[in-house]
Amino acid sequence: MKLYEYEGKEIARKYGIETPRGILATSVEDVDKAYRELNTGTVVLKSQVLVGGRGLAGGVKKASNLEEALTKARELFSMSIKGERVEKILVEEAVCISRELYMSLTVDRATRKLVYLASGMGGVEIEELARKHPDKILRIPVDPFIGYSGYMARHALGFLGLQWDKLGQLDNIMRAMYKIMIDYDAELVEFNPLAYTCDGRLTALDAKIIIDDNSLYRHPDLQPLYGRDATPYEKVAKQLDFNYVELDGDIGVISNGAGLTMATMDSILHYGGRPANFLDIGGGATRERVREAVKIVVTHPRVKAVLVNIFGGITRCDEVASGIVEALSETKVAKPIVVRMLGTNEEEGRRILIEHGITVYTEMDEAVLRIIQLVRGVG
């Protein structure tokens, strides 16, 4: 679960990490009040969205006077960034920046440890930095039996090229990041940029914290926030009790069982396609459940074609086939659909699909290759 920047900064301040003075605004009138209260001349207006890339999308603006702040606030409140409307703006004092650094603590799934990532090139996406300048990133693994230790700050200090008198500040920040990570069951604590200000302070100009959804039972204060970062399709799927996650591809995926669904996605990637989602209908899915699953996937604007991969154990293939046909009849969406079907009542399921002009395969690889051809407009 992602937290907004202002929420991440509230947590950071609670643990002693310095952030710029700021006030949250939900209207232009609030921006007016915030500007007057900050009484600082130049301010930064930062749209509060849970998607990335807001800076490139124009979601962060500077203003040097009240009139300019109100004009730019109106612009921000009228924006949508990657489909998410801007409903909150963090109005912050502008900070004189000497250098922009990067600092995060995250989970290294390969080593099954927490790892600090530090770089002297802050303000850019860490994925882009890792791709273009991997030598500019310092990795400091954390022994789970020891936790944070002061040598980590000394190591980072030298790599970042900071003066020795900044060790205390950096140590406090890294120690606090570790405490936040543990106390909140976080998957990521990131300050990008972590600014080295003109007067020699280390200040978190941005804060990104992601909480492990599975830990929310331990955090009742965070439970009301769960699901707010879901897309409209994910919200519908949640209401219907589907395991559904949106991805960036264009091939819709529906299968039964998490293992088979992931294997289907892996196969699509292996042959050069890009899955648009993960949707597991579960075992013993009824015609009605299949119908609703297909409707979610086939109506998504990014999906160009749909692959349904079913192994019929307690799931009956004829029920699946009937659900597919009903969904296509109700939605009237003309997108290619390919089905791989094997197992209980397979023959009846194949008959139903073939009668309605839907291609059916027995082998998964054949079905995957066919759906990729259809997406590419081949055959």
Swiss-Prot record:
- Reaction(s) catalysed (UniProt annotation): succinate + ATP + CoA = succinyl-CoA + ADP + phosphate; GTP + succinate + CoA = succinyl-CoA + GDP + phosphate
EC number(s)?
A: 6.2.1.5
Q: Pathway, according to UniProt?
A: Carbohydrate metabolism; tricarboxylic acid cycle; succinate from succinyl-CoA (ligase route): step 1/1
Q: What does this protein do?
A: Succinyl-CoA synthetase functions in the citric acid cycle (TCA), coupling the hydrolysis of succinyl-CoA to the synthesis of either ATP or GTP and thus represents the only step of substrate-level phosphorylation in the TCA. The beta subunit provides nucleotide specificity of the enzyme and binds the substrate succinate, while the binding sites for coenzyme A and phosphate are found in the alpha subunit.
List ligand-binding residues for substrate.
256, 313-315
Instruction: Name the coenzymes or cofactors required.
Output: Mg(2+)
- Kindly state which keywords UniProt assigns to this record, in alphabetical order: ATP-binding, Ligase, Magnesium, Metal-binding, Nucleotide-binding, Tricarboxylic acid cycle
The keyword Nucleotide-binding is assigned to this record: yes
HAMAP family, sorted: Succ_CoA_beta (MF_00558)
Native source species: Desulfurococcus amylolyticus (strain DSM 18924 / JCM 16383 / VKM B-2413 / 1221n) (Desulfurococcus kamchatkensis)
Report domain ATP-grasp positions: 9-236
List the Gene3D superfamilies hit by this protein, alphabetically: ATP-grasp fold, A domain, ATP-grasp fold, B domain, Succinyl-CoA synthetase domains
Record protein name field: Succinate--CoA ligase [ADP-forming] subunit beta
Q: Which PANTHER family match?
A: SUCCINATE--COA LIGASE [GDP-FORMING] SUBUNIT BETA, MITOCHONDRIAL (PTHR11815:SF10), SUCCINYL-COA SYNTHETASE BETA CHAIN (PTHR11815)
What quaternary arrangement does the UniProt entry report?
Heterotetramer of two alpha and two beta subunits.
